[in-house]
Amino acid sequence: MFEFFAGGTTIFGGNFSEQQGGFVFGFATEQGIRAFAKPNGTDTIHIESEDFGSFDIEIGDTEPRAEEAETFSALVRGIMNCFIESGNIFGGFDAKISSEIPSGSGISVTVPFEILIGKIISGLFFENSVPALRLAQFGQIAESDFFGRPCGISEQLISALGGNVLLDFSDPEIPKFEKIDFDFSKSGYTAALVDCKEVFSEDFSEILKDLGFVAWNMGHNSLSEADEAEFIAQFPILRQKCGERAVFRALDFFEESRRAKEEAEALQNGDFCEFLRIYEESGKTKLKFIPEEKAAEFAEETEKQGFGLMFVL
């Protein structure tokens, strides 16, 4: 038996920046998904899990299945398909999988699950030689095309790389990444996972639409193609064309992409207080872009749980 692990992910700065070619800064949590796996000498992948169910996938049966939408078997099939499409030949394996990520924590379980399956195949059959970027790309394809939930690649990359990671999406086809060396345990703080009820999914998708609409009205494919000064100069016209909410969200894109870099720089310099200041600033701006009724619901939860303080003494 061989042990494998993929951490959950959270974003410190640069929310929604990926889709517009900006910067993202996040980290892989110590809580994630763990597996014990071994080759079984067959053409069957056998998954056994109390958290994700037990099922078998036949190697070579790579077509997406409608009935598997939003299931973990779809993710395994998707990862398997990516390896095979890349010309990689491998055998079946048995894996016992368990999750350490609390339900309702706001941290995706699909992302570390995808990366975990990729790590198992890479580790058992290819001497752990598959690069993190390739594993992340496989995860993105599995989630978008097999699981049925379109997504970016930020979280997959962070989970695959581990630790604190600054991502640069100026070239979306080949994102750049930099590992930031900082030990949070030595800061006197810890990152706490709390139940945030996951109440904002639909509202977050609207943010992406707003950002894309502003970029289109500026004649660009993404906001990163525009200079911030150009955006400010066109602000009055864009406000008329796109609406107030969209243009202020676009303004936050420029600020948030910059914050991601500043947060990473603060930790590189060992300035945790400056990192916290920027992180808090980022959180406050997000509240301004949540609809009133959702903001009230969020405020009620944070009052009960102190959710606004992710970092606690």
Regions found by a protein language model. Give the residues of each.
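C-terminal nucleotide
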Residues: 1-13, 34-74, 82-85, 89, ...
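Gly/Ser-rich oxyanion-binding loop with an adjacent helix/lid
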Residues: 1-22, 69, 73-184, 197, ...
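A short catalytic or substrate-binding loop motif that flags glycine-/basic-rich loops and adjacent residues
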Residues: 17-19, 27-29, 257
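Structural signature of FAD isoalloxazine-binding scaffolds in flavoprotein oxidoreductases
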Residues: 22-41, 161
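Short, amphipathic alpha-helical segments that act as regulatory/interfacial helices
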Residues: 29, 80, 118, 212-215
